[in-house]
Amino acid sequence: MDCYTANWNPLGDSAFYRKYELYSMDWDLKEELRDCLVAAAPYGGPIALLRNPWRKEKAASVRPVLDIYSASGMPLASLLWKSGPVVSLGWSAEEELLCVQEDGAVLVYGLHGDFRRHFSMGNEVLQNRVLDARIFHTEFGSGVAILTGAHRFTLSANVGDLKLRRMPEVPGLQSAPSCWTVLCQDRVAHILLAVGPDLYLLDHAACSAVTPPGLAPGVSSFLQMAVSFTYRHLALFTDTGYIWMGTASLKEKLCEFNCNIRAPPKQMVWCSRPRSKERAVVVAWERRLMVVGDAPESIQFVLDEDSYLVPELDGVRIFSRSTHEFLHEVPAASEEIFKIASMAPGALLLEAQKEYEKESQKADEYLREIQELGQLTQAVQQCIEAAGHEHQPDMQKSLLRAASFGKCFLDRFPPDSFVHMCQDLRVLNAVRDYHIGIPLTYSQYKQLTIQVLLDRLVLRRLYPLAIQICEYLRLPEVQGVSRILAHWACYKVQQKDVSDEDVARAINQKLGDTPGVSYSDIAARAYGCGRTELAIKLLEYEPRSGEQVPLLLKMKRSKLALSKAIESGDTDLVFTVLLHLKNELNRGDFFMTLRNQPMALSLYRQFCKHQELETLKDLYNQDDNHQELGSFHIRASYAAEERIEGRVAALQTAADAFYKAKNEFAAKATEDQMRLLRLQRRLEDELGGQFLDLSLHDTVTTLILGGHNKRAEQLARDFRIPDKRLWWLKLTALADLEDWEELEKFSKSKKSPIGYLPFVEICMKQHNKYEAKKYASRVGPEQKVKALLLVGDVAQAADVAIEHRNEAELSLVLSHCTGATDGATADKIQRARAQAQKK
């Protein structure tokens, strides 16, 4: 353990700092870092280098090359820079490289050097040029702030939703500030800048002069400033060699340190961690690195070569041509276990486990000491926590073995923390591998989340590793393997050196029916890459027609989209395609397409019936569908025409169509309707009243109700209304009028073709039993019983039923007998039944 703490450096009495190597860089740089624009993404992100050929002391002879590397120095991309002079580079939270040019244009590149998009910081910037720029991160996303040649600031807090803000002018500012940075306070981005001995804070509304509390006297200039990773703290380097550290609000001073160096540093960044004991700032010069905090002494390191500092959530990454290191405050659990002569529970447990492996009795002594103090649970937790903060797998294993050893002597220690730490460390060790090059710490990993880490592996096209992690952690398929495979497929369609057939087959073999994977999304990506045929092949694997059709329409494959919509059976989908086709094709081609798709044609006809009647007529004409054309003209005659002449003309057209369709019945019926309309018009002119649009029967009934019996009879003869129907019409009309005398005359005019039972029924319906009895006696024998029962003459009905010896009639009469009034009649029927059975 003594050897293990050899690289620990105390800062004051409360904290230790250590620096260890992450990778030995093998990136074969052709330029010194000082000659390059450098950008390194946080959370173990990639490194971008662009040799600066626009420096005045080094005239450019060739175009510069933009190189992108992993944190381990593995090359990811290299491209010849063909655009304008670049002022600054920076990485967004999505690991997109932002290149801020002198003309105010910001070019956005992917991790593999693929151009994504560009945007401008405004016309004023274009006119005045960019002097300096900062890329910063907020809870809203990644932002860009620039300083123009007119010494004005412009910023956007989120490049994904670009909204430019021109900051207020600084009074009397005639030259570029000596240093400046972006502060994020209360969800608002501010600019803090130094002009000589003065500090100014710019927000969207005003420019305010600010003074750091407790600043040492004699300051004539601020040479460097740094804001912490979380934007909570600020450090200022003055020309007197003092470093002031305080809150970012400039309301509270934390400490001040005199480094006795007045030369401006190359970089200054914060080095702290969550729940840090000692907040510290790391300052770098050409060959010196200094860690300062609230202590009279500092920690100093010699830099053998040009180095670059990358602030992280819990420390600072330092890389040069040959190495990549991590400097951080030793976590509390590690300090408790490993510091010299530590008697912490975790330290004793680690020693106990080592002695146990040696089969030494000291293991029992250490263990008993921990148990006697009641600190075994704390010891296990310390070892688990410390294992998470260790970078070397061997030390992780030692600590986890100690934790596992201690757990054996605890009855109810929850296993979740141990299991999760083992899983997390296995994931971290996998991504820290040199060939992967993502040197995440445990704290960074927890802040980043597993989903974001998987996204970053996908971004690096490390699909197998991402899938292995998903399977190892048993993530739900939709969040894990399915999502990774979908990304892989979207990348696969961009490989233009492979045939469409092979790509489609490979994707289907790999994905199959994996839940959560949308073939339509993959096909859309293929179409976006200009591979239309591949997109169509991929859509064949998409089971949801609702996802197939919109993309097919977008690809101008409307006829195929129509076929797919019809196959789905979704009428709404078919209508969507039809309306698209209607707007896309000329009228003739559209109708021809419909003729080849009967279902679509039928649906379109239904649509036209409600929306486009003239189009419907054209469809019938084109198909020579005279039957439907006749029906169309009949509907049109009533829907569109109010004049009787126009209506008759439309009906005549319909009759002609029916004759062409060889439907003589429909043609004759239409001609009869024309005659009826003309007659109704004449009746209205001669008799008054409302006759138009009545049916033939209603017309006859209306005439009878109006007392025009002769005209009604003449109408019946003209239209060959059968006698039975005419008698029913007249019977009903006279009963409605309650003209019983005329009804009796009508019944005696000749023998009724409908019999006399209807007369009985109609009279009873009008509650006139007296009139009903008149007709009951005239009812024929086969309906006599029913008529007598209708008028309530149960006794006579019984006599008739007995006389007819009809069992059904006897049962009918018996069902109408009531015990109080018809008892004798019921007995009479029962005796008749008994006599009939004896015979």
From Swiss-Prot:
InterPro entries the record matches: VPS16, Vps16_C, Vps16_C_sf, Vps16_N
Residue span of region Interaction with VPS33A: 642-736
Modified residues (3'-nitrotyrosine): 4
Transport recorded as keyword: yes
Gene Ontology molecular functions: actin binding; actin filament binding
GO CC term, one of those recorded: recycling endosome
Any Pfam family the entry gives: Vps16_N
GO-annotated biological processes: autophagosome maturation; endosomal transport; endosomal vesicle fusion; endosome to lysosome transport; intracellular protein transport; regulation of SNARE complex assembly; vacuole fusion, non-autophagic
Localization per Swiss-Prot or TrEMBL: Late endosome membrane; Lysosome membrane; Early endosome; Cytoplasmic vesicle, Clathrin-coated vesicle
S-adenosyl-L-methionine found in the keyword field: no
Keywords: Autophagy, Cytoplasmic vesicle, Disease variant, Dystonia, Endosome, Lysosome, Membrane, Nitration, Protein transport, Transport
Tissue spec: Ubiquitous.
Record membrane topology: Peripheral membrane protein
Complex formation: Core component of at least two putative endosomal tethering complexes, the homotypic fusion and vacuole protein sorting (HOPS) complex and the class C core vacuole/endosome tethering (CORVET) complex. Their common core is composed of the class C Vps proteins VPS11, VPS16, VPS18 and VPS33A, which in HOPS further associates with VPS39 and VPS41 and in CORVET with VPS8 and TGFBRAP1. Interacts with RAB5C. Interacts with STX17, MON1B. Associates with adapter protein complex 3 (AP-3) and clathrin:AP-3 complexes.
Disease: Dystonia 30: A form of dystonia, a disorder defined by the presence of sustained involuntary muscle contraction, often leading to abnormal postures. DYT30 is characterized by early onset and predominantly cervical, bulbar, orofacial, and upper limb involvement. Some patients have a more complex phenotype with neurocognitive impairment, including mild intellectual disability or psychiatric manifestations. Loss of ambulation is observed in some cases. DYT30 inheritance is autosomal dominant with incomplete penetrance.
Function text: Plays a role in vesicle-mediated protein trafficking to lysosomal compartments including the endocytic membrane transport and autophagic pathways. Believed to act as a core component of the putative HOPS and CORVET endosomal tethering complexes which are proposed to be involved in the Rab5-to-Rab7 endosome conversion probably implicating MON1A/B, and via binding SNAREs and SNARE complexes to mediate tethering and docking events during SNARE-mediated membrane fusion.
Family: Belongs to the VPS16 family.
Stated name of the protein: Vacuolar protein sorting-associated protein 16 homolog
Organism of this sequence: Homo sapiens (Human)
